[in-house]
Amino acid sequence: MSAFRFLGLMVLLLLFSACGENSAVETPTDTVNTSKDEETQEVVKEESKTPIEEKIELKNFFMRDGAVASYLGEGNEYASYQARTQWHNDDTVSIYEDNGGTTVIRTYRITEGSIDLIKEQGEFYEQFNPTNDDLKSLPTLSTFLKLPLEKGTTFDEWTLVNVDQMLETPFETFDGVIVLEKTDDSGAIQRKYLVEGFGEVKREFLMKENDAEFIVTSTLETVE
């Protein structure tokens, strides 16, 4: 074999060797890309398993039909009262509030996005038994609660100032309390504390006069 032919064979062997090395390098790259694709698919699968936030049922901000709740009052002789719940249908409920001096009825219509007051009457000592058509004909007087239940939500001069407050009451200590606040033209502050499953568990009225602070509260004490 001549020297030139031998050199030619050596060059071919080196070229084949180089090609083999390049192929060996490219194979892991494809494997890495495949692994990344699989990881991405796994992440997507995990995200798809994340539970969707449960829809808020505004009707849960009232007590059961026939429930009688007693509220302990401080700061005023009429701050203590009893509240009886009467459900008319799936989306309409009345609360009879008796403070020892008078009984006030408030009737609410519940929609997907709000709880609206549709009847309010003092000196009411009867049982309110309207037909569904009667209830549908009642106009909205004001809004009691409105979605979204997020800090900063406003409606009818009320502002949602807290959605996760802890509150101690004579009945029990509540977590996740929703706090609504309103300030009137005189500077007096009103607050309502709402809990899912119970509704209003506390109301508060604060007013400053000269250097004195006047506070009236009604706080849930018992439920029968």
What kind of region is each of these model predictions?
Residues 14-18:
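C-terminal motif of bacterial Sec signal peptides marking the signal peptidase cleavage site
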Residues 1-7:
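Bacterial N-terminal signal peptides that target proteins for export
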Residues 7-8, 183:
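Short hydrophobic/aromatic segments of transmembrane alpha-helices and their interfaces
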Residues 20-224:
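Conserved functional acidic sites
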